[in-house]
A protein has these predicted regions:
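Structure-specific nucleic-acid interaction/processing domains
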Residues: 2-35, 39-119
Length: 119
């Protein structure tokens, strides 16, 4: 690859906006949700779906429902996002965003797939 082409590709890559934030996977059959965060929301659903389709997702209750209801019964939605470039401490920011949504939606027990964390 010549220098000009490489430079052009690098500039194009720098222009791609990467968003971090909070997502939910929703079981549309029983309305249960899983709340999670990612520093790359665009790629997160691909990873989650691959785990679920290969029966390797770490959340056993979500995996069971995925197997029982099928992939067409689930949806992925970004519920809050921020552009990464202006964030100093991404992990801290994601943790706080997730805490807010967990508090708001309470996706535990019959309402969801998240586990309550001990405070």
């Amino acid at each position: 690859m010549d220098k000009d082409k490489r430079k052009e590709l690098m500039e194009a890559y720098k222009q791609i906006k990467v968003y971090m934030g909070v997502y939910q996977i929703k079981n549309n059959e029983n309305s249960k949700v899983l709340i999670g965060t990612s520093c790359n929301l665009k790629n997160r659903w691909l990873t989650l779906r691959m785990q679920l389709e290969s029966n390797r997702h770490p959340n056993a209750r979500l995996q069971k429902d995925w197997n029982d209801f099928g992939p067409d019964s689930f949806s992925y939605e970004v519920i809050e996002q921020k552009e990464c470039k202006d964030i100093v401490n991404i992990n801290w920011e994601l943790e706080n965003m997730e805490k807010e949504w967990l508090e708001k939606l309470q996706p535990y027990d019959d309402k969801g797939y998240n586990k309550k964390l001990m405070q």
